[in-house]
Swiss-Prot record:
Catalytic activity, as annotated: L-ribulose 5-phosphate = D-xylulose 5-phosphate
Pathway the protein contributes to: Carbohydrate degradation; L-arabinose degradation via L-ribulose; D-xylulose 5-phosphate from L-arabinose (bacterial route): step 3/3
Cofactor(s) needed: Zn(2+)
Binding site for substrate: G27, N28, S44, G45, S73, S74
GO biological process: L-arabinose catabolic process to xylulose 5-phosphate
CDD domains reported for this sequence: Aldolase_II
One CC-aspect GO term: cytosol
Keywords (A to Z) from UniProt: Arabinose catabolism, Carbohydrate metabolism, Isomerase, Metal-binding, Zinc
Originating species: Halalkalibacterium halodurans (strain ATCC BAA-125 / DSM 18197 / FERM 7344 / JCM 9153 / C-125)
Enzyme Commission numbers on file: 5.1.3.4
Single annotated GO MF: aldehyde-lyase activity
Record-annotated active site: D119, Y226
Chain residues that bind Zn(2+): D75, H94, H96, H168
Protein name according to UniProt: L-ribulose-5-phosphate 4-epimerase
Gene name tied to this protein: araD
Amino acid sequence: MLEQLKETVFKANLYLPKYQLVTFTWGNVSGIDREKGLVVIKPSGVEYFEMKSKDMVVVDLEGNIVEGDLKPSSDTPTHLALYRAFDKVGGIVHTHSVWATAWAQAGKEIPAYGTTHADYFHGTIPCTRPMTETEILGDYEKETGNVIVETFRNKDPMSIPGVLVHSHAPFVWGKDPMEAVHHAVVLEEVAKMAQKTLSISERTLPMDSVLLDRHFYRKHGQAAYYGQEKR
């Protein structure tokens, strides 16, 4: 079942240690088949280099295991909440990458200071509010997804494909699992650049909005011209 998606999700998970986004098993990638309403996700607590594509777990959008011998990631309810809310998202990544997680632990959003940021994120990368005691002690992972959805109530998740969960770490997404990993790598680099920028000048202001728009829309707008035409 969903063998091609399993292989894609498996390979996407292996990029997390390759790009130094995870330590031990501190992260996961998932992908969704929208037509079937099924999600493929990394198994919980399994080392990346011990996994096979057949170890990926298939669940429905309510979290029921449809196929797989292993338990799905403990973050599965968060992924599912995002898939239910963001209908254009096709892949999700969660990591504890050092620089992005540092911003999350500080409870700080990441302003757009330069064009590297603007090429992928159309504005500030938000940080969620702190979760309440009731949310933490209740259905914690599902509530983590809900607080992310709340944060994007007036934002386009495809224009800002990532978030920092307060006191936790980043969740990032894309149109498919590989794009989600790409965005996770970019988020980590942007977080590092932002912190280094502030270490040079703590009074640095966000970049000019005209420049922000130019860089974002040249890659993602209707008249985008960056890269090669698809044939």
